[in-house]
């Protein structure tokens, strides 16, 4: 029974990648809208977009790490 709960926890941890995909889409769409409104700030906004993408992707990289920890490190007693 605990092995099934462990698998469910690992599966739930991987759902964070869906949230990261939504977040990256929001960052990029906001960047496109901002450049469309003010093209003279395109270089500065590109830097902010890359920063937002990197922070969102960093949060997404924790999801597989947690899934692996749940699956392989935590022992069922």
Swiss-Prot record:
GO molecular function, one term: lipid binding
Annotated site (Reversibly protonated during proton transport): 57
Tree of life domain: Eukaryota
Keyword Disulfide bond: no
Coarse class of the protein's main subcellular location: mitochondrion
Membrane topology designation: Multi-pass membrane protein
UniProt entry keywords in alphabetical sequence: ATP-binding, CF(0), Hydrogen ion transport, Ion transport, Lipid-binding, Membrane, Mitochondrion, Nucleotide-binding, Transmembrane, Transmembrane helix, Transport
InterPro entries: ATP_synth_F0_csu (IPR000454), ATP_synth_F0_csu_DDCD_BS (IPR020537), ATP_synth_F0_csu_sf (IPR038662), ATPase_proteolipid_c-like_dom (IPR002379), F/V-ATP_Csub_sf (IPR035921)
Record-level GO cellular component terms: mitochondrial membrane; proton-transporting ATP synthase complex; proton-transporting two-sector ATPase complex, proton-transporting domain
Bilayer-crossing regions: 8-28, 45-72
GO BP annotations listed: proton motive force-driven ATP synthesis
UniProt-annotated location(s): Mitochondrion membrane
CDD domains: ATP-synt_Fo_c_ATP5G3 (cd18182)
Biological function: This protein is one of the chains of the nonenzymatic membrane component (F0) of mitochondrial ATPase.
UniProt record similarity statement: Belongs to the ATPase C chain family.
HAMAP family hit by this protein: ATP_synth_c_bact
Subunit annotation: F-type ATPases have 2 components, CF(1) - the catalytic core - and CF(0) - the membrane proton channel. CF(1) has five subunits: alpha(3), beta(3), gamma(1), delta(1), epsilon(1). CF(0) has three main subunits: a, b and c.
Protein name: ATP synthase subunit 9, mitochondrial
Taxon lineage: Eukaryota, Viridiplantae, Streptophyta, Embryophyta, Tracheophyta
């Amino acid at each position: 029974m605990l092995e099934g709960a462990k698998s469910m926890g690992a599966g739930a941890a991987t759902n964070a990648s869906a949230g990261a995909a939504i977040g990256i889409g929001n960052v990029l769409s906001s960047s496109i809208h901002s450049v469309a409104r003010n093209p003279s700030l395109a270089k500065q906004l590109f830097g902010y977009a890359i920063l937002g993408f990197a922070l969102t992707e960093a949060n997404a990289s924790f999801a597989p790490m947690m899934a692996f920890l749940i699956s392989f490190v935590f022992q069922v007693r």
